[in-house]
């Protein structure tokens, strides 16, 4: 789960990874150098007595070549190889983690769109998630200023189904959501959230869309089986302290998706969509693309030219060798089982003075009705007394 706020490619997560790599490399460099204390830094033997060993090593770079040319024992060679393997494995794991983080939605939207809601009302997540699925948004009818309330988001789907993962294998669906609040509304700070609401929120971590838009909240991807219903703790603004806010009815927009997208922001297809023929002709050959899966389809056109269409692991072929196909004809099934949906809601920022005035009005109406009843009883008694005379 992406639990850090990333507004740019070089955001806090990437910086932390860089520092982690530096510390790891420094550690292995120290271990590597300590294997040969007699030959390192011959001009400065006190370097091992201080914490300047790395700087000294860099300053004495000519001695490095004499150092590595030193005749090594077998045990020392083995230690060097193990150190290098450990560094390479660490680099690969960190790089892989960084790539997965940067490719996780809603990072795509944050990096490519200043505002997630277009002028037409469509949320930009629909540019990559092409299938339409329902989402639900539950809001209170009205809230008081400077109070914390719940916005409940439901992303329903059949939890028995599995989606195609990036490596072509099957796995569970993730869910994500973007909640566009009115200006002034924001995520409630932890010290303002009631304990009961904290239990409903669980371990979810919400992000601002960017530092300039704290009223737009995003979350995901998170496991769909656990978080197909999410509670957003929202803090309402106070017009008494923020003069840009008024006591009005405000719209709230929700976008929610389950599963992976079909198109990347650069326009390329993912392996979670249908693949079509780039040209018409006859399929003359189908070969596996790699051990991990995928296919290379060779299509021979009417003029004898052969075109190779590449299909990544994931989609299943629905054509065979010798079959005649037309341009843009589907070569695979559509493996996508997820989709994106939008939902709008409204909430009233209620003025406490209006509420107090309404209560006073109701009391006045009740008293008026009571006095009318009493006056009617008095009038009936007077009429009855006059009739007796």
Swiss-Prot record:
Q: Which UniProt keywords apply?
A: Chloroplast, Electron transport, Heme, Iron, Membrane, Metal-binding, Photosynthesis, Plastid, Signal, Thylakoid, Transmembrane, Transmembrane helix, Transport
Cofactor binding, note field: Binds 1 heme group covalently.
Q: Name one Pfam family in it.
A: Apocytochr_F_C
Asked if the record carries the keyword Transmembrane helix, the reply is yes
Compartment(s) of residence: Plastid, Chloroplast thylakoid membrane
Q: Which GO terms describe its biological process?
A: photosynthesis
| Binding residues for heme | 105, 125, 128-129
Q: Which GO terms describe its molecular function?
A: electron transfer activity; heme binding; iron ion binding
Q: Which InterPro entries does the annotation name?
A: Cyt-f_TM (IPR024058), Cyt_f (IPR002325), Cyt_f_lg_dom (IPR024094), Cyt_f_lg_dom_sf (IPR036826), Rudment_hybrid_motif (IPR011054)
Its membrane topology? Single-pass membrane protein
Q: List, alphabetically, the GO terms of the cellular component aspect.
A: chloroplast thylakoid membrane
Cofactor(s) needed = heme
Q: Kindly indicate whether the keyword Plastid belongs to this entry.
A: yes
Check the record and name the SUPFAM superfamilies matching this protein. Cytochrome f subunit of the cytochrome b6f complex, transmembrane anchor, Cytochrome f, large domain, Rudiment single hybrid motif
Q: Where are the transmembrane segments?
A: 355-375
Q: Where is the signal peptide?
A: 1-42
Question: Which domain of life, per UniProt?
Answer: Eukaryota
Q: How does it assemble?
A: The 4 large subunits of the cytochrome b6-f complex are cytochrome b6, subunit IV (17 kDa polypeptide, petD), cytochrome f and the Rieske protein, while the 4 small subunits are PetG, PetL, PetM and PetN. The complex functions as a dimer.
Similarity section: Belongs to the cytochrome f family.
Question: Which function does this protein serve?
Answer: Component of the cytochrome b6-f complex, which mediates electron transfer between photosystem II (PSII) and photosystem I (PSI), cyclic electron flow around PSI, and state transitions.
The name on file for this protein is Cytochrome f
Species of origin reads: Pleurastrum terricola (Filamentous green alga)
Q: Which gene encodes it?
A: petA
